[in-house]
């Protein structure tokens, strides 16, 4: 419940007798995602510059971590780091940074709910995504005021924890690049091009498709009206983040 600074967990196994349990958190809650086991819920408290972590089995908060200015993970990203084991990451609305933390309290208790590393980017962003079959984590820089930076996405190597490529998605003056989504097998990732400027530009949007191995452009789906979020049904059903 965003404005209250509370997480409400609803047990709907008996619809006639719903049970709601409340956990106090920092404010304001916005955008969350589960770890790969689907036990721990990871959610941004962006006004407090924190990520909050809830154990959905015990229904208790297990951690709270300062990550940077206004974390905004979108649908989030989970992957395996060579040093820290299972990790997750977030972009930030208030600064150009991706923060990565451990999220495996059973297998890697020393790393759980602690920062593994942070990486600086060129500007603040909205969304971060990956896929188990991809070597990379992709994130945007949509909130930076300079068009050239808004129009580019960054590629983070899972093995090294370093940014290995900047992809200029568009060079249209009033456009920006936003929101990455992988296809079901992780062989492609799709990025939206969102064109501003009123009705005259409504149908100038695009979805750009990239090869997730070579990072090269495959094709562009053109003539779209301000495309933004793209959600692969298979990935969401099987919790591939």
Region annotations inferred by a language model:
Residues 1-241:
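Predominantly soluble domains enriched in secretory-pathway, periplasmic, or organellar proteins
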């Amino acid at each position: 419940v965003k404005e209250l600074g509370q997480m409400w967990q609803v047990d709907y196994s008996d619809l006639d007798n719903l049970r709601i349990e409340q956990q106090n958190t920092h404010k304001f809650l916005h955008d969350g995602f589960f770890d790969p086991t689907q036990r721990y819920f990871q959610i941004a408290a962006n006004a407090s510059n924190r990520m909050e972590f809830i154990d959905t089995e015990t229904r208790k908060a297990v951690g709270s971590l300062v990550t940077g200015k206004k974390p905004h993970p979108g649908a989030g990203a989970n992957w395996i780091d060579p040093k820290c084991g299972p990790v997750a990451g977030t972009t930030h609305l208030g600064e150009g940074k991706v923060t990565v933390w451990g999220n495996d309290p059973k297998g890697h208790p020393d790393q759980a709910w602690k920062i593994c590393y942070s990486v600086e980017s060129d500007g603040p962003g909205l969304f971060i995504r990956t896929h188990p079959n991809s070597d990379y984590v992709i994130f945007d820089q949509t909130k930076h005021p300079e068009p050239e930076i808004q129009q580019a996405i960054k590629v983070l190597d899972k093995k090294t924890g370093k940014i290995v490529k900047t992809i200029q998605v568009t060079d249209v003056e009033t456009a920006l690049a936003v929101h990455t989504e992988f296809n079901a097998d992780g062989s492609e990732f799709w990025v939206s091009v969102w064109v501003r400027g009123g009705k005259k530009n409504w149908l100038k949007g695009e979805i750009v498709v990239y090869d997730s191995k070579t990072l090269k452009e495959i094709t562009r789906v053109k003539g779209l009206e301000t495309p933004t979020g793209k959600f692969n049904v298979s990935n969401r059903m099987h919790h591939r983040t």
